[in-house]
Regions:
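Non-catalytic beta-sheet/beta-sandwich ligand-binding modules that flank or precede catalytic cores
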Residues: 1-189
Length: 189
């Protein structure tokens, strides 16, 4: 019903604040809700806060509830050579690495194409959960390799784009050491 005394103060909110309250008509009102942080938010109108033209008090509104998520997901890249961890920036002679990509939030659209590599190739990419993905990295030759996930390549359930992962750097070294010269300091014969 039409009302003329419904005001922004009749609305109770948690988890944010209302602004730009306006009457679009005598029965429709609009406002902008801005969350203060990630988490639960509610908007409510209690009973008997405004009246209709005949002076009848309103009944309680159905509370509007939802959870706000404005945090961008992050991705952590780690590697192992079987059961041993391989540190970022290290040098090894492992023919393959198992690379694990761990998202801070569940995602359903992280795919192998979101990953960039240099010095090798990824295969056997699979999801072990909605936050953990694995792949096998095979270097193409001795030398520096990188594995990276750029910003804005996947989203969380709320639609937030990811931040860039810290690049994983590893050097593959299968060069056999050689001795270039041998000299004797003295001859005892």
């Amino acid at each position: 019903e039409a009302t003329s005394n419904f005001v922004v103060g009749d609305i109770t909110v948690s988890g944010g604040a209302l602004s730009d309250f306006a009457a679009a008509s005598s029965t429709v009102y609009t406002a902008t809700f801005t969350p203060t942080a990630d988490g639960a938010a509610t908007i409510d109108v209690a009973p008997s806060t405004f009246t209709d033209a005949s002076g009848n008090n309103n009944t309680a509104a159905t509370q509007f509830n939802w959870t706000y998520d404005g945090t961008a997901p992050t991705m952590t890249i780690t590697a192992t050579d079987g059961s041993n961890a391989v540190s970022d920036g290290s040098t090894t002679n492992d023919a393959t690495l198992t690379v694990t990509f761990t998202s801070s939030e569940a995602t359903s659209n992280f795919v192998v194409g979101d990953i960039t590599v240099s010095g090798g190739a990824l295969n056997s990419f699979s999801a072990t959960s909605s936050t953990v993905y694995t792949a096998t990295f095979t270097p193409s030759a001795s030398g520096a390799t990188t594995i990276d996930v750029a910003a804005n390549t996947f989203t969380d359930a709320a639609g937030n784009n990811n931040t860039a992962a810290t690049q994983f750097n590893w050097t593959y070294d299968v060069t056999v050491p050689t001795i270039s010269s041998v000299s004797l300091a003295s001859d005892n014969s």
